[in-house]
């Protein structure tokens, strides 16, 4: 058993179905087919620990008022040997279930037994999943969108790993195409300017300080060696140097941010291997392309897109769409991923339907591709929005953010809201060492527990075997609420993995910290009666395990002292 909440839900389903069949046998209910029993956590505590609207779902089939069905089912239930303490019928026909103390005791035993593996579930059954995220243009430093995408993608990968998937983290290097051409022309202009030659950064080129820095470094290494060579040769050397340095810098910054990739995949490699041209040929052979205005178009409207798009420009150069289709075919066919997840900025939403359509055209199930779209980031300081601009060079970079607030706060804050919600990142709040700062609040809970453990160990209090601890003594409301929240950790992992919702873990860990602080502010651990002290010791050890495991998923430090 890895998910005790799931076990309780299964018991409820079983009890409900047996009661339903018993009621039919006795002629109290009449129906032909049975709907699925959905068991959910109610929003209000007074509505029990778990609930089902099954009676409402069955009302039409049974030709009876849902409340009456619920009452009949409840009257026929046999809950002995289960985690169910009592059953109540509420409202128009909800059946609410309250869990017994055995559920609480088994939860704590399970956490102590599984330790650092508590929360892991086997949802994925070892399936190969790839999470591709950040994939920033290697033409300059990483910005706030990349910072948010990094936090979302990396935590998502950790959640999927916890959920039993075989996960690969990937960075797609956009080292081919139009922006690389502009990058080359921008570097060339700066290099020539440094040599005293009149040159201008082209329209739509890169004007940032980083471009000047790269040109200066190149000049220091090569001097005026490239002054009089043909422009194409000069740009090729500058691009090669600039990309190498920028990618090295990206890797350094991402490691500081807690992100290490399994694969760095080059777009250019898809051209070198011929995969881009092969996929264009395949789509053409299957009848999914046509020529218009000298260009080759992909019939995307066949797959639900609003309009067709160009695969090969009239000058014979493939578009970004063509290389991206080849890239996704490489993920599914060449490398055999069962599931591919891309974390993209919301401005790429128009690219989702074409990509899924292209997969369908290639005979790949488009449901194996998921795209998490994330909204924009606003940085707030002193109540004012801090503006940022990539092209003017006055941009706040990922490294600036890490230096300003630290890795922990950055990763935590970016995962506090769902990816599809815009985020206002309060720099002042992220630096506060107070309970107003959610990351401090959670870390303080962990440090506080470590402090209590040290004090208890100094007194000689220890738990040799959890079976010898009288966990039935934990009956106070704050204790019960806390244990029930701990029970939900594997369920949170399951839901977060199914719905690609990394913010669930951040919210969950805040809830655990809040319930722990409430418990500790109301009840003594040290100084309680001996058996109760041991039971509470077992409880706070379980809280520490869950906080540490959840913070590890977020790659946020769990400090032992603060």
UniProtKB/Swiss-Prot annotation:
Cytoplasm is among the record's keywords: yes
Bilayer-crossing regions: none
Primary site of residence: cytoplasm
Pfam families in the cross-refs: Arg_tRNA_synt_N, DALR_1, tRNA-synt_1d
Top EC class for this record: ligase
Record GO terms (molecular function): arginine-tRNA ligase activity; ATP binding
Motif ('HIGH' region): 136-146
Quaternary structure and interacting proteins, as annotated: Monomer.
Protein name (database record): Arginine--tRNA ligase
Species: Caldanaerobacter subterraneus subsp. tengcongensis (strain DSM 15242 / JCM 11007 / NBRC 100824 / MB4) (Thermoanaerobacter tengcongensis)
Lineage of the species this protein comes from: Bacteria, Bacillati, Bacillota, Clostridia, Thermoanaerobacterales
Gene: argS
């Amino acid at each position: 058993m890895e998910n005790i909440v799931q076990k309780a839900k299964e018991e409820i389903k079983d009890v409900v179905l047996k009661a339903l069949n018993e009621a039919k046998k006795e002629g109290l209910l009449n129906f032909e087919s049975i709907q699925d029993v959905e068991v959910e956590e109610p929003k209000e505590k007074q509505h029990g620990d778990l609930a089902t609207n099954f009676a409402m779902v069955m009302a039409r089939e049974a030709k009876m008022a849902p409340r009456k069905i619920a009452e009949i089912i409840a009257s026929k239930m046999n809950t002995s040997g289960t985690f169910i303490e009592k059953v109540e019928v509420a409202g128009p026909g909800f059946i609410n279930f309250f869990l017994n103390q055995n559920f609480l005791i088994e939860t704590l035993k399970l956490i102590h037994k599984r330790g650092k593996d508590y929360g892991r579930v086997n949802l994925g059954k070892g399936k190969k999943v790839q999470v591709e995220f950040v994939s920033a243009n290697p033409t300059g430093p990483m910005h706030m969108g990349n910072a948010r995408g990094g936090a979302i993608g990396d935590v998502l990968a950790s959640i999927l790993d916890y959920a039993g998937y075989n996960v690969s983290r990937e960075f797609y290097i956009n080292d081919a195409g139009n922006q690389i051409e502009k990058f080359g022309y921008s570097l060339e202009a700066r290099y020539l300017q440094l040599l005293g030659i009149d040159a201008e950064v082209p329209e739509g080129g890169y004007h940032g300080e980083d471009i000047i820095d790269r040109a200066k470094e190149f000049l220091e290494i090569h001097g005026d060696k490239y002054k009089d060579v043909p422009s194409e040769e000069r740009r090729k050397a500058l691009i090669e140097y600039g990309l190498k340095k920028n990618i090295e810098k990206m890797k350094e910054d991402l490691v500081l941010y807690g992100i290490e990739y399994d694969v760095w995949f080059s777009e250019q490699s898809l051209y070198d291997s011929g995969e881009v041209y092969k996929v264009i040929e395949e789509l053409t052979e299957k009848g999914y392309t046509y020529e218009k205005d000298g260009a080759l178009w992909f019939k995307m409207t066949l797959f639900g897109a609003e309009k067709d798009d160009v695969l090969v420009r009239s000058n014979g150069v493939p578009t970004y769409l063509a290389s991206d289709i080849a890239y996704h075919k490489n993920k599914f066919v060449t490398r055999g991923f069962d599931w591919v997840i891309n974390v993209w900025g919301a401005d790429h939403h128009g690219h989702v339907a074409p990509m899924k359509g292209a997969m369908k055209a290639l005979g790949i199930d488009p449901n194996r591709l998921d795209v998490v779209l994330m909204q924009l980031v606003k940085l707030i300081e002193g109540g004012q929005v801090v503006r940022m601009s990539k092209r003017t060079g006055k941009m706040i970079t990922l490294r600036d953010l890490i230096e300003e607030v630290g890795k922990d706060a950055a990763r935590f804050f970016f995962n506090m809201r769902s990816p599809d919600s815009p985020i206002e990142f309060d720099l002042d709040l992220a630096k506060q060492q107070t309970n107003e700062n959610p990351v401090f609040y959670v870390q303080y809970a962990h440090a506080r527990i470590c402090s209590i453990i040290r004090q208890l160990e100094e007194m000689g209090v220890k738990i040799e075997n959890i079976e010898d601890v009288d966990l039935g003594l934990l009956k106070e409301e704050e204790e019960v609420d806390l244990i029930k929240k701990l029970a939900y950790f594997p369920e949170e992992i399951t839901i977060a993995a199914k719905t690609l919702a990394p913010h669930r873990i951040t919210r969950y860990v805040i809830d655990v910290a809040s319930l722990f602080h409430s418990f500790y502010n109301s009840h003594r651990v040290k100084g309680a009666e001996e058996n109760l002290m041991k039971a509470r010791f077992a409880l706070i050890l379980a809280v520490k395990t869950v906080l540490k495991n959840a913070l590890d998923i977020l790659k946020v430090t769990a400090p032992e002292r603060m």
